[in-house]
């Protein structure tokens, strides 16, 4: 009986502690200010998408000259990406975030612009631990689709997007095999991969690839 009296207050205390956390286990709560998605629950009482320019009307919002409805109505579209657009999933340092960002290198030409947008917006809001997750997928996208990458960068005439991506790759865009103390070797691998994937690559684009590699790993 004494043991039970001790356990009950402990359970109550644990529940209160969990309720104060921004991310809790999906099996523990049904609070009205939370959204159940995947393996986590995120509180949604703060608008973390400020500055995204969204109305959350998929027929009004557009990404890469197409309404968002074009992407989210596609039966192949990832639910994680849809949740991200709707503001129901905020990236943080977990496996769901890693899965979302890895979608940017998909071979699906119809959905890739949407996934790339998710990666770009995550780069915009990254801080702390989240910054550890953006560099590799950003580098992989640039390596796999070099022409598309530069076209995407050029769409922003301010140059801020390019700087953001450079910062992300410079910070966390190292592969396991990379020697961070040898940036010359990393640049060599990066330029070789991009040029191999750059079909009918002219000299101007090759020079841009060289500069990009130098910017990422000076």
Region annotations inferred by a language model:
Residues 1-9:
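Sec-dependent signal peptide recognition
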Residues 14-15:
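C-terminal motif of bacterial Sec signal peptides marking the signal peptidase cleavage site
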Residues 18-28:
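Bacterial Sec signal peptide processing site at the extreme N-terminus
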Residues 33-34, 39-40, 62, 157:
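Coil residues (strongly favoring Ser/Thr
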Residues 47-48, 92-104:
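Boundary/linker elements of alpha-helical solenoid repeat scaffolds
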Residues 61, 65, 77-83, 111-120, ...:
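Amphipathic alpha-helical scaffolding segments comprising HEAT/armadillo-like alpha-solenoid repeats
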Residues 86-87, 98-106, 115-128, 133-139, ...:
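Short secondary-structure capping micro-motifs at structural edges
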Residues 125-218:
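Extended alpha-helical scaffolding segments
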